Amino acid sequence: MRKSILSFLEKKGKNEKITMVSAYDYHSAKILDNCDIDIILVGDSLAMTVLGMQDTLSVTMDEMLIFTKAVSRGAKKSFVLADMPFMSYQSSDRDAILNASRFIKESHANGVKVEGGIEIASKIKLISQSGIPVVAHLGLTPQAVNMLGGYRVQGKDLQSAQKIIDDAKAVQDAGACMLVLECVPVKLAQKISSILEIPTIGIGSGKYCDGQVLVYHDLLGLNKDFKAKFVKHFDKIDPQVGVEKYRDEVKSGIFPSEEHSFDYLDDELLDKLY
């Protein structure tokens, strides 16, 4: 049976960790599906990981649709989540709904992911009201890398931390069914996870999120040119073994450890957040 948004909400309620991996092809999707990974994210990170681009901004809808189709063919039980690429939803309500629906109709995805907070809440509402599950993404949002001044931790001071909390509440109220938190301090991610009713999925945001996500190529150590602080290599010899190790360490709370997380907020500042 296909995993569902309802099953992820139940996991949060039972304090059971959700496993997510970003992958881009039929073969890796089959491995992840066989390893009982909850969610396969067809991330726009494929622009850099697979297509060799400098950032995620240049990947197109047509390219994302092709890779999502491949993953959908390989995943029989895992929930397939498609990243909506840069400017496929920001420009207008019409674009947001039409492009989201293309992922469902043409690529057989089960939901879509968008980056941003209050500023895209209206689009999250429109897409979710059309019957398409929407996952939001806050913190380090790669599509806004030029605005953020590079790939760096977000929410390190009172003002920016409160902004992320406000955005998290806004996307939940708009109908988002889940929230990815990328590169935010551990204690901030913990606070957001406790405030929200929807599950949080962390990447570089500590062990207190309701689940974790890593890129398939990263957790297997296939990218020799780059290793972020939040990445752990599990096994590059046998992909199935590597994915199973990742799954088990997420579920048991071993991963991520302090080594793979960021913590810039002291308790005095944390007490001022609401």
UniProtKB/Swiss-Prot annotation:
Annotated keywords: Cytoplasm, Magnesium, Metal-binding, Pantothenate biosynthesis, Transferase
The record's free-text note on cofactor binding: Binds 1 Mg(2+) ion per subunit.
Residues where Mg(2+) binds: 44, 83, 115
Involved pathway(s): Cofactor biosynthesis; (R)-pantothenate biosynthesis; (R)-pantoate from 3-methyl-2-oxobutanoate: step 1/2
Catalytic residues in the record: 182 (proton acceptor)
EC identifiers of the protein: 2.1.2.11
Signal sequence, renumbered to the chain: none
Localization terms from the record: Cytoplasm
Pfam family, one: Pantoate_transf
Keyword Transferase applies: yes
GO cellular component labels: cytoplasm
Alphabetical GO biological process terms: pantothenate biosynthetic process
Reaction(s) this enzyme catalyzes, per UniProt: 3-methyl-2-oxobutanoate + (6R)-5,10-methylene-5,6,7,8-tetrahydrofolate + H2O = 2-dehydropantoate + (6S)-5,6,7,8-tetrahydrofolate
HAMAP family in the record: PanB (MF_00156)
Self-association state and partner proteins as the record states: Homodecamer; pentamer of dimers.
Name of the protein this chain belongs to: 3-methyl-2-oxobutanoate hydroxymethyltransferase
